[in-house]
C-alpha cells in the first residue's frame, strides 16, 4: 500500500479556492468538504490522460455507472440496491432540493439538526417548506443529538434531513444514534418506505 504524506502543504494560490480567497484576513478556514491534501496519484494520472485529448466538452455518464454504484453499496454496506433505482445528481444541495420537491409538499415541515450547512437549510426554505431546527447539544467536547427536542420536532414534520458526517460539526453519528432515530421515528414515511 502506498504511503501518503498528509503534512505536505500545497499552495492554492491562483486556483480560485473559495476557502482561501480571504487569506489576507485573520481567518483559519475549517471546511469539511474541501480538504488540503492531494488526491490519489491514480486519479491524477487518469485525469492527465483525459487532459491530453485537449477537449473539455460536455460528457455523459458511463453505461455501467449505476451498476458500479450498486456494487459499491453491496461491497461496503451489504446493501443490495437495484441499479435502476440509483439517480445521478451532480451536487448534494441539488439532490436535497429534488428530494424535497418530489416527496414533500409546499408548507410541509422538515427537520434538520443545527448548526447546519446553510445551503441545505436554504433548500428547505426556497422550496416553500417550513424548516424545524433541532439544536445539537455540545457536551464534553463533542456534539450530541437532543432526542427529546428531536422527538418534539418530528411530531410536526414529514421529513428529516440527516447528514453524516454532520456539517459543520464533523460528527459521525454512531450506530446507536442511527438506530434510535430509525426505530423511534418511523412515522416519517413515504408511501411504503421510511425516510429515516
Give each language-model segment a name:
Residues 35, 136, 190:
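Hydrophobic pocket-lining residues within nucleotide cofactor-binding pockets
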Residues 2-91, 98:
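N-terminal small-domain helix-loop-helix segment of the aminotransferase-like
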